Curated annotation (Swiss-Prot):
Keywords: Cytoplasm, Golgi apparatus, Nucleus, Phosphoprotein, Protein transport, Repeat, Transport. This is Amyloid-beta A4 precursor protein-binding family A member 1. It comes from Homo sapiens. Putative function in synaptic vesicle exocytosis by binding to Munc18-1, an essential component of the synaptic vesicle exocytotic machinery. May modulate processing of the amyloid-beta precursor protein (APP) and hence formation of APP-beta. Component of the LIN-10-LIN-2-LIN-7 complex, which associates with the motor protein KIF17 to transport vesicles containing N-methyl-D-aspartate (NMDA) receptor subunit NR2B along microtubules. The modification Phosphothreonine is found at T305, T370.
């Protein structure tokens, strides 16, 4: 018998068995680090003798087997030792009750104030072991004191001792806390705090069945209480592990996080039913045995404290069923304390279940493999690409069957549905992205037969392709010249068809057989597709279309192409910049026949207007801001032609001038066009021959506009015609000129309130090359063909083109410019040699 310092040794001998052999029951327990650091006071060490299981306990277990199955509990008992414990070949393996599957909170193991708490490593083989423990385990050959945090108490009274029965229950102290201590959950991870019950039962054929029943009920209640606590923890944290990370409750208990303490602090109202359940569960096991036992037998269960026991020593407290052996006073207090603790544990378990149910109702359980949905939609600006597809992807349908519900005219087919019947999703995506462009959801009403949305996607007309021809044209011919060119193209194609019918060789490039085609029109381009094969026959960007004419059921489409130039021509143009205005352009004229000729022409014209709106949108300008009413109000504030009407209406500015000269002598002047956009388009005196009749008279100045010569008006006539009229005065000795005095430099005043309003003219190399009719620039005095000399007092004669454009684009308010005809500027700067007439 070993003796430990500061502890009393107690030996319990089994006299009935007639043996003096004493064995110690060793518990394989692991001590947490917290308790290793804290030195506890020495405790009494208890040694027990060797006993055998009696038949009475087996009979008792048989009687209670049915109840065990109903409750789903398995009380595992063992009374032997197992090999391999503390450098010995025998190890005591304790009974692991079913509640050991569920861990208790590791926070109890980490609490330094609870000196009686300990951790026991759970071994999965314990369940299998307990089934065969009684038959297979060998006897222990050594004695050993139990750890000081194990609490060992004997269950004995006078009758039990006489029957040579002594039962011992090895257990740790329940998670008792003082009233002032904060509550901590008795839950733990896998391998956390566990309860192991070790029971040794000697040969006791006369064992009192009620004592065994009481022990069984106590152990079963403890198992049920801790199992419910662990179950509550698992239910409470199921929502935290609802992503499918665990495959089983065992694995869930193993990897479950610690309980959230804040969730237990929330107060809940427990109804009467839950209160009754708690009361029933907490008192069921304690009252059942007592109700069945006579009062006399109940009184016998309160013997004095066994010799050597220390009921008042710290850390030694038996469960409620065993505290009857402690004493009448201590037993009642300890029993109430234990009962209170059990009720607290049951209350917490019920509370956990209710919380888990509420959270499951309100929380969506989602698989971790489910991708997160974006919280808010993501909007992306449309890239600067053509909304129409390339020719290879186009599959138009016949134009005779327009799409239902479309506002396009009869005979037109929207390409958003007809070109791509197999890709409706992409077409709708383009529409939606286009609607979000610059946050302008609507279009300003554009006159025309088609829906602007359809023109952006593209519409298709059915037509017959008659042929194509080429013409040479000036850069900016008049409308009448355009119509004459269209008629000439039609006549050429008809002549070519007649030659083809007569089987005569037609001129090269002008004979094509009649072909059924689909004419694709959009704000980006115009394509001619073969109706059968859908191959692209011709493809012209919309910006290259210079003219469209409908003559009856004939449609003429003119596209501009610059004629290729040789190096010699480039050298000539470099030395003579005036040749730029006389440059010839190659016009490709396509002739079609269609019943919808007028609709085709109107649709192309509407496509230009919609394309302009798209341009405004791309630059952040709302087309609605440029409404007709608002723009009209702006024009009303603009000075008409910079007071040109007032200047021309003054009599002192308009004069009749008589020039005397010799017969056969030229007048000696150089004239240029006043420029398109002037209030009275006519010719201007750009230069005068030194010593000539015009200069010697002293009545003419450079910049004067000639209204008429000898009664013949020059207003609105081409420059070449005016030159011919002046040359015809060579044989006359007296010439009458009606002129309007004008300075050589024209002053322009444009009022632009903000950047929303476009100036309405374009500039190339400092020369105004186009002008929007009726715009603020035209009313301000801007004229086509004039060179910009000055902008807001700053000379731009030697300024690069890009800088001029930048200055004009960002100018607001009153914009003052000075311009003069480009030809006059070249003559005055000696860039050209004058040709006098």
């Amino acid at each position: 018998m070993n003796h430990l310092e500061g502890s009393a040794e107690v030996e319990v001998t089994d006299e009935a068995a007639g043996g003096e052999v004493n064995e110690s029951v060793e518990a394989d327990l692991e001590h947490p680090e917290v308790e290793e650091e804290q030195q506890q006071p020495p405790q009494q060490q208890h040694y027990v003798g060797r006993h055998q299981r009696g038949r009475a306990l087996e009979d008792l277990r048989a009687q209670l087997g049915q109840e065990e199955e109903e409750r789903g509990e398995c009380l595992a008992r063992s009374a032997s030792t197992e090999s391999g414990f503390h450098n010995h070949t025998d190890t005591a393996e304790g009974d692991v009750i079913a509640a050991a599957r569920d861990g208790y909170d590791a926070e109890r193991a980490q609490d330094p104030e609870d000196e009686s708490a300990y951790a026991v490593q759970y071994r999965p083989e314990a369940e299998e072991y307990t089934e065969q423990a009684e038959a297979e385990h060998a006897e222990a050959t050594h004695r050993r004191a139990l750890p000081n945090h194990l609490h060992f108490h004997s269950l004995e009274h006078e009758e039990a001792m006489n029957a040579a029965y002594s039962g011992y229950v090895y257990t740790h102290r329940l998670f008792h806390r003082g009233e002032d201590e904060p509550y901590s959950e008795p839950y733990a991870d896998y391998g956390g705090l566990q309860e192991h019950v070790y029971e040794e039962i000697g040969d006791a054929p006369e064992l009192d069945a009620r004592d065994g029943l009481r022990l069984y009920e106590q152990e079963r209640d403890e198992a049920a209480a801790y199992r419910q606590e662990a179950l509550g923890a698992r239910l409470h944290h199921y929502d935290e592990r609802s992503d499918g990370e665990s495959d089983s409750p065992e694995k869930e208990a193993e990897f479950a996080p610690y309980p959230r303490m804040d969730s237990y602090e929330q107060e809940e109202d427990i109804d009467q039913i839950v209160a009754e359940v708690k009361q029933s569960m907490s008192s069921q096991s304690l009252d059942k045995a007592a109700e069945d036992m006579p009062e006399a037998e109940q009184d016998l269960e309160r013997p004095p404290t066994p010799a050597g026991g220390r009921p008042d020593s710290p850390g030694l407290q038996a469960p409620a069923g065993q505290q009857r052996a402690v004493g009448p006073a201590g037993g009642g207090e300890a029993g109430q304390r234990y009962s209170k603790e059990k009720r607290d544990a049951i209350s917490l378990a019920i509370k956990d279940i209710k919380e888990a149910i509420e959270e499951v109702k309100t929380r969506t359980i989602r698989s971790p493999y489910t991708p997160d949905e974006p919280k808010e939609p993501i909007w992306v600006m449309r890239q600067d690409i053509s909304p129409t597809r390339d020719c290879d992807d186009q599959r138009p349908m016949d134009g005779d069957s327009p799409s239902p519900g479309s506002s396009s005219p009869l005979g037109a087919e929207s390409s958003s549905t007809s070109l791509h019947p197999s890709d409706p999703v992409e077409a709708s995506t383009n529409k939606e992205s286009r609607k979000s462009l610059a946050s302008f959801p609507t279009y300003v009403e554009v006159p025309g037969p088609c829906d602007p949305e359809d023109l952006i996607d593209g519409i298709i007309f059915a037509a017959n392709y008659l042929g194509s021809t080429q013409l040479l044209s000036d850069k900016t011919p008049s409308k009448n010249v355009r119509m004459m060119q269209a008629q000439e193209a039609v006549s050429r194609i008809k002549m070519a068809q007649k030659l083809a019918k007569s089987r005569k060789k037609a001129p090269e490039g002008e004979s094509q057989p009649m072909t059924e085609v689909d004419l694709f029109i959009s704000t980006q381009r115009i394509k001619v597709l073969n109706a059968d094969t859908q191959e692209t026959m011709m493809d012209h960007p919309l910006r290259t279309i210079s003219y469209i004419a409908d003559i009856g059921n004939i449609v003429v489409l003119m596209a501009r192409r610059r004629m290729p130039r040789s190096n010699s021509q480039e050298n000539v143009e470099a030395s003579h910049p005036s040749q730029d205005g006389k440059r010839q352009y190659k016009m490709i004229c396509h002739v079609f026949e269609s019943e919808d000729a007028q609709l085709i022409a109107q649709s192309i014209g509407q496509a230009f207007s919609v394309a302009y709106q798209e341009f405004l949108r791309a630059n952040g300008i709302n087309p609605e801001d440029l409404s007709q009413k608002e723009y009209s109000d702006l024009l009303n504030t603009q000075d008409m032609y910079n007071d040109d009407l007032i200047h021309f209406s003054k009599s002192e500015n308009c004069k009749d001038v008589f020039i005397e000269k010799q017969k056969g002598e030229i007048l000696g002047v150089v004239i240029v066009e006043s420029g398109w956009g002037s209030i009275l388009p006519t010719v201007i005196i750009a230069n005068m021959m030194h010593g000539g009749p015009a200069e010697k008279s002293g009545k003419l100045n450079i910049g004067d506009q000639i209204m008429s010569i000898n009664g013949t008006s020059l207003v609105g006539l081409p420059l070449s015609t005016c030159q011919s009229i002046i040359k015809g005065l060579k044989n006359q000795s007296r010439v009458k000129l009606n002129i309007v005095r004008c300075p050589p430099v024209t002053t322009v005043l444009i009022r632009r309130p903000d950047l929303r309003y476009q100036l309405g003219f374009s500039v190339q190399n400092g020369i105004i090359c186009s002008l929007m009719r009726g715009g603020i620039a035209e009313r301000g005095g801007v004229r086509v063909g004039h060179r910009i000399i000055e902008i807001n007092g700053q000379s731009v004669v030697a300024t690069p083109h890009e800088k001029i454009v930048h200055i004009l684009s960002n100018a607001v308010g009153e914009i003052h410019m000075k311009t003069m005809p480009a030809a006059m500027y070249r003559l005055l700067t000696a860039q050209e040699q004058p040709v006098y007439i």
